[in-house]
């Protein structure tokens, strides 16, 4: 069983379906031809998340029979992905959805009709990209290039139309669209960063302004990219975990007789494969401001709404329903020697910790965006997403840059309690997370063995504050904690001023009592809620 079998005249669909493989319900060749002749959607970033989510929901939309165009994928950084994971398989891939009960769902994705390398050194590919950007039919360009992918610098701005960064290449292609008649298009980031459309806009604007200043392009081009009737940069909220190809999944596919199961590691250290494995749960909420129409991705489950609502969904996720739970688990998980989030969910204290913190303390001030139910969202996080045995997420990864995350993930909830005049005594487990951070900074686990704290720009500075404290030492002076918990840059507010300083100090004393004190303190406060 190989992906390319699907395109052959004597393809045995029954064999695949008998083994649980969901096959495309549309004419793959007809969709490819229509897309080639009248392209509507180009996507930058050929990584795993693209195939697992945007391409997959388009595949679902095509399966309804109500749409007839695919997506053209473009890679601007790691060209080996195109050469090794796309073209040998005629752009087909297998999506393996990892269920929280340990089973998998298998679906062949055939919605990607072309794969191109965005670089002038690949002359044919670049010429095809120019042709696509000149096409009146083009509606949107989307991106999963990570937050760093939107960056630019003076050296690249100075390269003019030969820029090598993704935003520079995009702007050069937009200039072709401008010259073809100032044709409308929407540039839609689907990267997991707040206000993501602004990253695209900032990049395009920086290149366009520089090129106008340098006399490379006419001033009208800058007017074009700033004209919201021509070019828009909507926000979106995307949420789906797509780990690198999983050995367990490879073994399951091999057992089926599916031969395209090898992992590909590129020279740039991208992990890819002809298959992509991802969690079953997914959310894509997009600001509905498109200047030239858009593919009907709502047929595959995408939600379209206002910018305000997209922001509210992001706020719900980041300040209440997902990210705070992650950080609480990561701080205590590291001290309790866990290396997998899913394993932490089998620990009664830790599971109850995030459950009670989320439902009892954070949910009373949750932002309800309307398009997603916060209670359903957090319930899915606790019951499906975090316990998923296929998710290789580690508390050590999530603990990276914790000092930069605490103000948004916990400070915002505390501020809402204060602003609304709510009973601050309802906050017990959130202060326990913040107290746990002081203990985490000592880099000793609950058995008093050293561990390597995750990288953090303020790590050395904050460790120096708690340096006078020793775990297990009786009658020590904890006044140094004030220098930590007054830090508005870390917590979003002065926790002493807010009335939580003494409470947190008391918890820190308990956590520092000695060997086993982290577990004992956690159990005490969680059980009492």
Please place each PLM-identified region on the residue numbering.
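Substrate/ligand-engaging "lid" and interaction regions
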Residues: 1-44, 48-529
